[in-house]
């Protein structure tokens, strides 16, 4: 699998076949941030307060919207307004994992109506290609007005100890991404997947974005099996965007923590591309 990770985001944005990837890179360049904050809080007030305070320093906010005890229209209206105010994208970490007919309803309907507000979603590919096809068809339907601003990350690897997202599963993730490049933005993985074999030929302009979870300045794990990487180690292994949660939102000063992740993440990115960012 090819990698364009040595190129600056500005170059990748200008050549990228996926419109949401272009926007993502442009946001990152404008803000000099490749940080995704995982806002795993449980009330709308906490979520919106965190988004407003950290918004200037992040490229993406990642939500688990179903853990909010008071989810409602004010949640989404507030989050959309803050995304516009601070120029960040919204990533709903739903991890879709069901048959195609079910995930279409989960994505586009129900109480959460995720397709209406989340720029980025993710899925596991245990159900095989049909899950990617179903989500792509939903987002790219002719009567859906936000299709060019919606994209999918395939959960190709996980950072938890003993994860089974390896081997053939990871190879299948690459296969399906290559079949739906206009909708699949990239991967959630622990590294660039350049060495992963695939049965599908890569397009000449292939450029999948890599998000790496479990990034923490302390580089320690937790008692539930989470294994952390530092911003430098994650980006050195091929991450384009680093996902940090507790290292930011449980810090004594979350704003100062977000600034530290922004600085370290961006410096690591600049080192990787030889300081060629604009």
Swiss-Prot record:
Pathway: Pyrimidine metabolism; UMP biosynthesis via de novo pathway; UMP from orotate: step 2/2. Pfam families: OMPdecase (PF00215). InterPro entries: Aldolase_TIM (IPR013785), OMPdecase (IPR014732), OMPdecase_AS (IPR018089), OMPdeCOase_dom (IPR001754), RibuloseP-bd_barrel (IPR011060). It comes from the Eukaryota. The active site is at 95 (proton donor). PANTHER family: OROTIDINE 5'-PHOSPHATE DECARBOXYLASE (PTHR32119:SF2). Its EC number is 4.1.1.23. Keywords: Decarboxylase, Lyase, Pyrimidine biosynthesis. It comes from Passalora fulva. Coiled coil: none annotated. SMART domains: OMPdecase (SM00934). It catalyses: orotidine 5'-phosphate + H(+) = UMP + CO2. Belongs to the OMP decarboxylase family. This is Orotidine 5'-phosphate decarboxylase. The keyword Amino-acid biosynthesis does not apply.
